[in-house]
Amino acid sequence: MASTARKTFEINNNVQVVDPSAAIFQYSREEEKLLDDEAPWRTDPHYFHTVKISAVALIKMVTHARSGGIYEIMGIMYGKVRDGTFWIMDVAALPVQGTETRVNAGNEAMEYMVNFQTANAEAGKGELLRGWYHSHPGYGCWLSGIDVNTQLNNQKFNDPYLAVVIDPNRTVSAGKVEIGAFRTYPEGYTPPATGNSQYQSIPMDKIEDFGVHANAYYPLKVEIYKSKLDEKMLDLLWNKYWVATLSSNSLVSNLEYSTSQVQDLNAKLRAASQSISNSSSKLKLKPTQPTTKGKETTEGSDKKLKKGEKEFSGVEEEETPLNKVTQESSRITSEAENGIISQLLKEKLFNTPLTQSVDDKSAQATVQGRY
């Protein structure tokens, strides 16, 4: 069962296998120093575009983030950089003072970082400090104003440096790790205009902080990898992660999170209702595309249009407040259903007497939520 769950975890998070003999695993301080001297990221704010995180580091970060509960946690990441890509190979949790909305690294954490780096060097691990991670329990993966300032300072004095954010609550609810990686722009830099990015749910009380600093940083593509050399460590880490997952009840452990999501949804519905009355006057009609160039007949219609007339096929979809609320409502419902189905499966698995067996129809009905 544990092996099946691990395979499911790897599929959900698209874990890729990397050859352990690849050049990236052969550390060269001279190569790192040469890249540091060239520092192409100083002239190109978008030089870094991808971060590859080892499965070992990912499970460590998720386990650490979940242990913090409603409070933020913080840790550091070690690895290398090559061809515009961060390779994160290991992480370490920091002893920090966290709250529900922020986390601060004090003198104790700084001393721990120095000692950890020294111990790594003595153990023959030459990877350098390449970033930090922290959690946003229940409010998504993005950088707040404090996070942006922290990352700006890190990039000034420790570049190349990366910021990673994990949402443990949404990870538990959805099954897939909710993670984001970011780099800040230099002060005074104006990023180029981009199209609408993928929508993510931000609580009402965080939207202002999110919007004010949204153009101060950019996201990197996150990929997860593992090698055959990681198998033993993954087995040990997975046993701890799997037991914690199996013994927990997301409906109970995420009760406060689920309640806050419903309350936030209610607030957004109230805000969206105020704009509905004026929405009909702002609808944009979608013109029908002609089937052949130069002809005035349109697809699905034999009607000939007069000169100057246009035919429309519907209304263009727009990202309205009501559309966003609908997406959030669907997500909350899906997460609740997943939690219920998970508990039903555990009940069938562990509470069925040994003298009985679970028939195929009953098992299928449980998976489909028809208990």
Curated annotation (Swiss-Prot):
Compositionally biased residues, Low complexity: 278-292
CDD domains in the record: MPN_RPN11_CSN5
Renumbered ranges of motif JAMM motif: 134-147
GO molecular function: deNEDDylase activity; metal ion binding; metallopeptidase activity
GO BP field: protein deneddylation; proteolysis; regulation of cell cycle
Predominant location: cytoplasm
Positions bound to Zn(2+): 134, 136, 147
Region (Disordered): 278-333, 352-371
Enzyme Commission no: 3.4.-.-
Matches recorded under SMART domains: JAB_MPN
Subcellular location(s) of the protein: Cytoplasm; Nucleus
Family indicated by similarity: Belongs to the peptidase M67A family. CSN5 subfamily.
Name of the protein: COP9 signalosome complex subunit 5
